[in-house]
Amino acid sequence: EKAPLPLMINKNITIEGSSGKLPTDVDADGLVVRAPIQLGANVTFKNIKLQLVPQVVLGAGGRQNILGAQSPMAATIFAAGNTLTLDNVNTKVGTNSLQDKDRPYISGGTYKNNGTLGKKSIINIINPNSQTKFAAIYAGDYWNDRNIDVEINLNSSVLNNKIYTGGFSKKLTGNVSVRLGDKSNIYSFDKTNHSGNLNVTVDKDSYMDNLDINGIDELTLDENAKVILKKGSDLN
């Protein structure tokens, strides 16, 4: 496998657009990365267009696909036990509507055990714009079992409308807390590969329709929050 090594960010830093243009403008300040990103410290991306370009594996996908096949999960930001903040970030790759689903993944773990895992992964997705979207969010790791708590504060869209509170194929042991804002579109939580409590808070003035609360240990509604439960869902 010749996957690119991740871009390692090893100091507390804010990477922010400085032109004053909106992240959704065609000529917005932007960062294009053709590799995963891994945190080694607390990092904020703010007022910027962040394009994580999916890796193309040459020869994959059969003879008919001579250009190869995409490996979309290569476009992942790994929090690695640090605080990741995405503040008013446009995640769209390119300008073609066919690329609308080419969005970054987020993991609370590390890239193939690279770097050092911190004590707690905190993922903040705040002040969304119309192009603040993510392919999927995994609290856990892709390649290793982890013992770590994870906090996810989500106020944006996720393409599959769910949060994975474990790893992709490995176990996460630890508590996961999730806060859903009024711009989030989460309907369920997948606790596969997760051992620990799942506590969910719906932010004030937020409305959640058809929420499946199966697997949730504690559900909190802030002021003026409203939730309509999916039929048959059951709070533990």
Give a label for each model feature.
Residues 14-17, 39, 43-47, 58, ...:
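All-beta strand scaffolds that present successive hydrophobic residues in beta-strands
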Residues 19-22:
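Acidic glycine-/aspartate-rich tracts in secreted/extracellular proteins
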Residues 25-27, 53-61, 73-74, 92-105, ...:
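Short glycine/acidic-rich loop motifs that flank beta-strands on beta-rich extracellular proteins
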Residues 2-14, 24-85, 111-114:
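Extracellular beta-strand-rich solenoid/capping regions of secreted or surface-exposed proteins
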Residues 38-42, 78-83, 108-118, 138-147, ...:
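Right-handed parallel beta-helix/beta-solenoid
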